[in-house]
Amino acid sequence: MPPERTPRQRIIQLITGGRLSSYQLAQMLGIPERQVEEHLPHIVKTVARDPSRRFILEPSVCQDCGFIFRDRTKLTRPGRCPTCRSEGIAAPRYGIESR
């Protein structure tokens, strides 16, 4: 990737056509996972302005009971499951698809 691109541009490029977690994005970009999570709401707004693309959020899932966090508005991983109180939660994955 060219170094002159901003982190948001690089994240958009990586998640276009695929789905990655914030941890995977952080590893690929060499930046902290928290920083990736701070960029995501801005990326959602950028993609929403483009009618030819849409942001996809694969929600977090509890690894113990299978609860799916469908109604969650935050883009980060939840701390624990509201059903079984387990902390084993699969991270959400993000992607961008063409309409």
Language model segments and positions:
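Short alpha-helical segments that sit at the start of domains
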Residues: M1-Q9, R70, R99
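Short capping segments at the starts of secondary-structure elements
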Residues: G17-Q24
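Alpha-helical residues within the helix-turn-helix
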Residues: Q27
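Charge-enriched amphipathic alpha-helical scaffolds
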Residues: P32-R54
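Short, flexible, mixed-charge glycine/proline-rich loop motifs
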Residues: R49-P59, F69-L75
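Short cysteine-rich clusters marking metal-coordination/redox-active sites
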Residues: V61-C65, C81-C84
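Cys/His-rich metal-chelating microdomains
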Residues: I68, E87
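Short metal-binding segments enriched for Cys and/or His
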Residues: G88-R99
